[in-house]
């Protein structure tokens, strides 16, 4: 989350990140005996070293560092709880105006990760709408690397078809060369910013139009900032994005 965001958004992010870590510690993570959590954003949580962050912030380094310290200290010990235990507090950069349910992305249904409205100020979000173009040869190579059973020959208009979309407008499933796969598979294969995408053939190439950034589940960082700017505090933000939860000090 950008350190320039509103203080209540930063507090919400601090609690979400803390809760995610607690969840991994309690559940044992998914790295066996080697670690509880990693810094790969596609697996666990992204991390940037303080010195690198300060270099990126330039003249704002001191004020941004203090903002983050304040957000962490103000929420010290607090976590997002469902049934008294920390939740899988996933988050993403920006949604398409409605978040996604966990089952729509990972096929495991979690009661606190349901679709909710998200106030995304598209005009102020970098690359909220993105356009990516692929030649047929490039697209074929990328898709076959992830979907080796796909038959990508014949008319190009039939290479991808029959998309099924969820309530957020993201692609749940799509037929790729005769193989039905989840939209997240195509997103990963093509490096798209989200699974909320449409496509068309344009001058012989495949052009994809993408909305938002990230998996779309849980807290939207830009949505959280919009809520904070509108007057919501961090507890209101968290209980909006995570259904049926409580925000409280967790002693373990």
Give residue spans per PLM region.
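Conserved, single-site charged/polar hotspot
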Residues: 1-252
